[in-house]
């Protein structure tokens, strides 16, 4: 899959790039795996903005993904590779021998016709197979990793991401996360072998404002361009700066650590690198 550029027929097209989508084999065919999500657009139940610069974006249907991979011992064949508007990686439709069909995140190298399976242990170390962390060899690259047994994968789910199993200690497995953080994860948690596909996604250029709006991203106004009532950086004569960068609510930003202490901090061996 290559990055596709365009001739500059318009100024917005000059720098815009996309992926060629040659890996997509089908449109959605299983309607029971498609649902319509309510559009929050960054608002809470009172209609107030809780997440700025968000909007609904283009109309789309949510694909129900099998993050738990709990269909043990039943082989399934990759029927299609599809586009998912809610994520930057591709998804695969798995058709199991018992007639069940489920979507999974597409690992790098998995193609139509390949067979995948989930089990507690004893499977081949090949992309798409899922096992418990305690039964996967040290050094293996995995994705879609659970943080709590049975909850479903939460770690390393976006395009090109993966974790690496670094060792074992008692009932825990030492995992290196995509950020570089080293962390203990229970060995009972499930993980899928391989790296998430569509790694070239990071190389595309949005190129124009309208494409961001389709993705549900609204424009960001600089604080220095606002009035004093709207932002601590606002006001002044001309272009005045002269103060430390802060959020609209006065909290220091750009490098200031705001992460609260959590009970789960004891599972972090080393924090991520900058």
From Swiss-Prot:
<dbReference type="InterPro" id="IPR012340">
    <property type="entry name" value="NA-bd_OB-fold"/>
</dbReference>
<keyword id="KW-0687">Ribonucleoprotein</keyword>
<dbReference type="Pfam" id="PF03947">
    <property type="entry name" value="Ribosomal_L2_C"/>
</dbReference>
<dbReference type="InterPro" id="IPR002171">
    <property type="entry name" value="Ribosomal_uL2"/>
</dbReference>
<dbReference type="InterPro" id="IPR022669">
    <property type="entry name" value="Ribosomal_uL2_C"/>
</dbReference>
<dbReference type="Pfam" id="PF00181">
    <property type="entry name" value="Ribosomal_L2"/>
</dbReference>
<comment type="function">
    <text>One of the primary rRNA binding proteins. Required for association of the 30S and 50S subunits to form the 70S ribosome, for tRNA binding and peptide bond formation. It has been suggested to have peptidyltransferase activity; this is somewhat controversial. Makes several contacts with the 16S rRNA in the 70S ribosome.</text>
</comment>
<dbReference type="InterPro" id="IPR022666">
    <property type="entry name" value="Ribosomal_uL2_RNA-bd_dom"/>
</dbReference>
<dbReference type="GO" id="GO:0002181">
    <property type="term" value="P:cytoplasmic translation"/>
</dbReference>
<feature type="region of interest" description="Disordered">
    <location>
        <begin position="223"/>
        <end position="274"/>
    </location>
</feature>
<dbReference type="InterPro" id="IPR005880">
    <property type="entry name" value="Ribosomal_uL2_bac/org-type"/>
</dbReference>
<dbReference type="GO" id="GO:0003735">
    <property type="term" value="F:structural constituent of ribosome"/>
</dbReference>
<dbReference type="InterPro" id="IPR022671">
    <property type="entry name" value="Ribosomal_uL2_CS"/>
</dbReference>
<keyword id="KW-0689">Ribosomal protein</keyword>
<feature type="compositionally biased region" description="Basic and acidic residues">
    <location>
        <begin position="230"/>
        <end position="240"/>
    </location>
</feature>
<comment type="subunit">
    <text>Part of the 50S ribosomal subunit. Forms a bridge to the 30S subunit in the 70S ribosome.</text>
</comment>
<protein>
    <recommendedName>
        <fullName>Large ribosomal subunit protein uL2</fullName>
    </recommendedName>
</protein>
<keyword id="KW-0694">RNA-binding</keyword>
<dbReference type="InterPro" id="IPR014726">
    <property type="entry name" value="Ribosomal_uL2_dom3"/>
</dbReference>
<feature type="compositionally biased region" description="Basic residues">
    <location>
        <begin position="256"/>
        <end position="274"/>
    </location>
</feature>
<dbReference type="GO" id="GO:0015934">
    <property type="term" value="C:large ribosomal subunit"/>
</dbReference>
<dbReference type="InterPro" id="IPR008991">
    <property type="entry name" value="Translation_prot_SH3-like_sf"/>
</dbReference>
<keyword id="KW-0699">rRNA-binding</keyword>
<dbReference type="GO" id="GO:0016740">
    <property type="term" value="F:transferase activity"/>
</dbReference>
<dbReference type="GO" id="GO:0019843">
    <property type="term" value="F:rRNA binding"/>
</dbReference>
<comment type="similarity">
    <text>Belongs to the universal ribosomal protein uL2 family.</text>
</comment>
<dbReference type="InterPro" id="IPR014722">
    <property type="entry name" value="Rib_uL2_dom2"/>
</dbReference>
């Amino acid at each position: 899959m290559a990055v596709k550029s365009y001739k500059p027929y318009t100024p917005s097209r000059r720098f815009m790039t996309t992926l060629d989508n040659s890996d997509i084999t089908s449109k959605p065919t299983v309607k029971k795996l498609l649902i319509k999500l309510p559009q929050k657009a960054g608002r809470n139940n009172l209609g107030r903005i809780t997440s700025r610069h968000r909007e609904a974006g283009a109309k789309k249907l949510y694909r129900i993904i099998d993050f738990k991979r709990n269909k043990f011992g039943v082989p399934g064949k990759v029927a299609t590779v599809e586009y998912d508007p809610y994520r930057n990686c591709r998804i695969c439709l798995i058709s199991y021998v018992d007639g069940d069909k489920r979507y999974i995140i597409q690992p790098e190298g998995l193609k139509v016709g390949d067979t995948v399976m989930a089990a507690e242990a004893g499977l081949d170390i090949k992309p798409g197979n899922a096992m418990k962390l305690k039964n996967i060899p040290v050094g293996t690259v995995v994705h879609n990793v659970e943080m709590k047994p049975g909850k479903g994968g939460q770690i390393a789910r976006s395009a090109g991401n993966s974790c690496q199993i670094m060792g074992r200690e008692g009932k825990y497995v030492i995992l290196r996360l995509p950020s570089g953080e080293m962390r203990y994860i229970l060995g009972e948690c499930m993980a899928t072998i391989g790296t998430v596909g569509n790694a070239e996604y990071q190389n595309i250029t949005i190129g124009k404002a309208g494409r961001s709006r389709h993705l549900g991203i609204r424009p960001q106004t600089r604080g220095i361009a606002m009035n004093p009532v709207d932002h601590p950086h606002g006001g002044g004569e001309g272009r005045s700066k002269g103060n430390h960068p802060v959020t609209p609510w006065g909290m220091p930003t750009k490098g200031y650590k705001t992460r609260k202490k959590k009970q789960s901090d004891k599972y972090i061996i080393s924090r991520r690198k900058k």
